[in-house]
Amino acid sequence: HPDGSLRALMRSKHERIAESISTNGGKTWSELKLTEMPNNNSGIESLTLADGRHLLLYNHATGRPDKKDGWGRRNILNLAISDDGTSWKLVGTIEKQETGEYSYPAMIQTSDGLVHMSYTWRRDLVKHVVVDPAELVPGESLSAEGL
């Protein structure tokens, strides 16, 4: 972040993505705090782009109350963007199928500026998707409300 702070986003069993912040280069971290972004105890991936914006690849779903581990369906995989790492807007839905499962996302930005995403596709394959961040248009604001 421009102020030198570090923000770590992580999965949680509490139906929201959790975060911790360091203001001393990672020597110490704040207590975990739940964000507004939904999470069903599934893996997430965040990336700070070369232009300073942030991307988040995650399952847009909350957990199942009947499961003590918090896991829920992983049939929606969203890509979100943020200017500050706190407020997120939908860029697009990468996958959405009633019976699908899309999990364990990963992202990198290569020297040509493109963002490469990979994730498990229906627990069968690993899918690779490439996007140009210059073409990403923020849409609606995202939160777990209404899920």
Describe the residue ranges of each PLM region.
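Asp-box/BNR beta-propeller blade signature and adjacent active/binding-site loops
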Residues: H1-L147
